[in-house]
Each structure stands twice: as structure tokens, then as C-alpha cells.
């Protein structure tokens, strides 16, 4: 199979109005900004799967194999503009306390040398690009052994990120940083049939959570759910998860299932939130690797 996908995100004019407490307990305008953002991503992929059934008397194992390749490119560009005004401006009195900023403040009559003016907050550090190459192959075998059924296999993955970031704020100064990993992810699934309606399952598998482009880049973007700015961390490492699962399953009738499961997950280098304080009070969230974590339950 062969696939192609394209995704984009275009924010042509996002306006952010920030207010703060001023005299007489009224909320006054603190800052007005406009942001123009464009993200484009292209993904090309190809994959192939193979299956071979064998028969050795009553023993009927199955061999499975496959390969997968993916190439992804991304570009992200953003520009931010701020409205400014001088302390001795000739704007209408009390404009900072206007309820409808768009209608009462951002009007043609309020633009001028001694009124409102618009300037760009140049920051090339917020732009980035990159590409990702992933090559994978897997091999697995299914072994029916009477009441037991064993499926075991492994997946090999080669993954390479190339992130292109600017090193200077006021000019285009792209620098490429490469991140590469070669990993093997084993898995095994053991099923034991107690009878026609009940069975036990035990499984183990290893997986990975790789950092995304925006989690690695130095780009700063505003997250409305957090109510704060977010910045990436180019020192992030992939997080690896070892998954264990033990399950009892009962099928009392067709279409019905009752199961009880215990799971345990061990995380190495999990990616977590962190934050720093900028400008005395503003929070900037980012990402970091914790040393490890465990998660288990029933």
C-alpha cells in the first residue's frame, strides 16, 4: 500500500486582547496583539505485509512479516504584531477601559503618530521546519499448541528527525539538528483456553513515544487551554514504555463478554510538563524527560 497525506493550519489574523486590574477595580487593556501563523505538513508512506500458513499434521503455525516506510516534512511560520501608544497620546479619554475593543479602539480614526501604531515583534526563533524518516520491519509467528496459543514477534524501527531552527532572533539563521534512533520492540501474547467460554491472556510489549516537532523546537506558541505560552525543548529524548497485561475473559453467550484485567506499565524518560516564570509573573510551559514512572491498575 502507498499513501499520501497533507495537513495545514492557517491562522490568518488571531487577535489577543489582554486586560489587567487598574484603578477603581476596572479591567483595563494591557496589550493587544495580532498573530499570523501557517503550518504545512506532507506525509508519504508505503507498507507491505506478508502471511504464510504452514501445516505439519495437526500443528498449524502462521508466519507474519511486513515493512513500512514514512517520510514527513513540516514547515511552521508565524509573525506577531503589537499595538502601541505613547503615554501622552491623543486617543479618546478612557479608551483603555473600552468594552468593545474592535469597535471603540481599533478604528481608523484612532491611528496616527500620537495615537495607535502597529509594530512587528520580530522573532525568527518561533519559526521552524524539519523532516522525519521512519523505516520499520516486523516478524511474528503464531503457534497454536492445544489449549495454548502463543504469538511472539519483534518490530525494528529506524527513526530520524532533522529539525531546522533559527539561532538568532532578528534574522534568518537556520541550523539543523538531527535526532536518530534504532530500536527493537519485542512482543509476546500467551492465551490459555480454560474451556469453550473462558480463557486467560498474558501479554508483554514495548512501545515508544517520540517527541513531536513542536515539542523539540524553540518556537513559543500560546495555548488557550493552559492560558499560557508553551515552548519546546530540543534536549527531549524518546520515552519507552514496557507494557504488561494479565486478563481473564468469560464469554457467557454470543455477543457477551466479562473480563477482569491487571495492567502494569513502566516508563523510561516519560515526557512531562514543566514551566518557568518569565517577566516576574508570566508562566512559560515546556516539556522535559522525567527519570521514570510506573502505572498499574485493574
List the predicted regions and their residue ranges.
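Structural signature of Gram-negative outer-membrane beta-barrels, strongest in the C-terminal barrel
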Residues: 37-47, 53-267
Amino acid at each position: 500500500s502507498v499513501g499520501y497525506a497533507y495537513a495545514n493550519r492557517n491562522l490568518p489574523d488571531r487577535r489577543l486582547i489582554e486586560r489587567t486590574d487598574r484603578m477603581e477595580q476596572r479591567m483595563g487593556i494591557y496589550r493587544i496583539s495580532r498573530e499570523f501563523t501557517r503550518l504545512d505538513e506532507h506525509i508519504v508512506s508505503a507498507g507491505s505485509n506478508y502471511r504464510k500458513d504452514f501445516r505439519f499434521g495437526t500443528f498449524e503455525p502462521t508466519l507474519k512479516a511486513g515493512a513500512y516506510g514514512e517520510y514527513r516534512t513540516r514547515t511552521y511560520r508565524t509573525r506577531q504584531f503589537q499595538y502601541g501608544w505613547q503615554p501622552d497620546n491623543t486617543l479618546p479619554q478612557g479608551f483603555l477601559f473600552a468594552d468593545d475593543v474592535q469597535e471603540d479602539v481599533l478604528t481608523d480614526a484612532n491611528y496616527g503618530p500620537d495615537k495607535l501604531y502597529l509594530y512587528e515583534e520580530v522573532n525568527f526563533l518561533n519559526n521552524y521546519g524539519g523532516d522525519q524518516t521512519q523505516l520499520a520491519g516486523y516478524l511474528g509467528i503464531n503457534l497454536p499448541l492445544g489449549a495454548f496459543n502463543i504469538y511472539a514477534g519483534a518490530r525494528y524501527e529506524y527513526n530520524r528527525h532533522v529539525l531546522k531552527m533559527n539561532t538568532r532572533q532578528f534574522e534568518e539563521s537556520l541550523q539543523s539538528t538531527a535526532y536518530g534512533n534504532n530500536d527493537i520492540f519485542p512482543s509476546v501474547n500467551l492465551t490459555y483456553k480454560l474451556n469453550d467460554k473462558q480463557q486467560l491472556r498474558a501479554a508483554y510489549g514495548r512501545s515508544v513515544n517520540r517527541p513531536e516537532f513542536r515539542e523539540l523546537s524553540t518556537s513559543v506558541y500560546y495555548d488557550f487551554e493552559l492560558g499560557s505560552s508553551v515552548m519546546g525543548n530540543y534536549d527531549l529524548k524518546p520515552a519507552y514504555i514496557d507494557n504488561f497485561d494479565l486478563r481473564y475473559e468469560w464469554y457467557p453467550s454470543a455477543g457477551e463478554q466479562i473480563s477482569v484485567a491487571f495492567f502494569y506499565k513502566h516508563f523510561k524518560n516519560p515526557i512531562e510538563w514543566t514551566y518557568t516564570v518569565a517577566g516576574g509573573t508570566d508562566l512559560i510551559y515546556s516539556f522535559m524527560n522525567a527519570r521514570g514512572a510506573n502505572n498499574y491498575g485493574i
